[in-house]
Amino acid sequence: MNNFTLFLFSCLYFIGGNLKALVLGINTRPVVNSLKKLGFYVYSVSYYAPEDLNADEKYYLINPLVHGRLKENYDENKLIEIANKLADEVDCIFITSGVFEFENSKIPGWDNVIGNGPKKINEISNKYKTYKKLKNLGFNIPETKKINNKTQLYKFLEEFKTCILKPIYGSGGSILKIELNNFDDEIINEIKFPIIAQEYIRGKSFSANFIGNTFITFNKQIIIKGMYAGNLTPYINLPNKFVEIFGEVIESFELKGMSGIDFLIKDNGPYIVDINPRILGTYETIEMSASQNLAMVLLNNKYAKEIKPRKVYIKRILFAKEKIIANISKRDFIHDIPKKNAVIEKGEPIATVIAKENIKSIINSVYEECAEYEKRKEDRENI
């Protein structure tokens, strides 16, 4: 039995259900469920409330039976307000995506956060300042410009022909690709300036994951219509020199806990497109690949070197192809399961599939358990 395993067993013995944790973010399930396996009493403060969320106390924004649209219904301030009331009751706080990533985010002074705190997350979520710092430090980034109006955007497109548009604040999320020969006024008029424009670099998207200053793994990202839709972990066909480069980024930004760097490859070198200073979407695939409880490692970073992802896992977030009624059964490989008969809008997430093989057949089986809302409505009317 190695030292890491001994540490796990000793923690399980001493914790004994006495420690309390709070997990905060849009989707807290992976971290919550890891902490429950360690014996924690867990509070979940989130937007989503899947059926397989095992928290002791759940606070959520979504209507489990009528999901609506995330962009219209999400309210970061409500989550932070709830978390603030619980913060003093818990021993530790874990932060996932979707909070402290906006210009007007309220920044609490919590001193029990595991990893990067709200202030650090907010600082790095200012993409424009982060890109400027990366460039000043000598790291490769795509050519980037802050765009204040349609005229500036057109000039940028004249130079690069194709570009990627991103909001100034935020980490991860969706992006918009536009081209000079398809400069659509209808689309442009919907853009909220100022915005960031970047040169378009053709190629696959990757991420590098760290815990503290310890490199954990590379991942190949699955991007569908400009939106993160999953990943493959680990991805091993990348040079070790990339690890050194990204290690310098982690050190330069003084990042703690779990952090990720998204990048593309140009001229055989990495070009950084995002820094994510909080618990990542790859959390679960790393856990499965390494056969270790990642929450334990986040609680004690010195054991990060024991995390060795080996088995290849694929994660896919499934989105509704039309407005649907979901009736997804609980089974292996399926996560983030909605409440039975939940109505989910077109384009919104249905569930998450994580598997080593047969991923397509599993995905198809999930879609087969979803009925078209309009067809179901029509069937009811004909009864």
Swiss-Prot record:
Residue intervals of the ATP-grasp domain: 131-303
Q: Which domain of life is it from?
A: Archaea
**Membrane-spanning parts:** 6-26
Q: Where in the cell is it found?
A: Membrane
MF terms (GO), sorted A to Z: ATP binding; coenzyme F420-2 alpha-glutamyl ligase activity; metal ion binding
Task: Report one GO cellular component.
Answer: membrane
InterPro entries, sorted = ATP-grasp (IPR011761), ATP-grasp_PylC-type (IPR003806), UCP016817_carboligase (IPR016677)
The record's section on Pfam families has: ATP-grasp_3 (PF02655)
UniProt topology in membrane: Single-pass membrane protein
Q: What is its main location?
A: membrane
Decide whether keyword Membrane is in the record. yes
Which UniProt keyword terms apply here? Membrane, Transmembrane, Transmembrane helix
Q: Does the keyword Transmembrane helix apply?
A: yes
Question: Which named protein is this?
Answer: Uncharacterized protein MJ0776
> In which organism is this protein found?
Methanocaldococcus jannaschii (strain ATCC 43067 / DSM 2661 / JAL-1 / JCM 10045 / NBRC 100440)
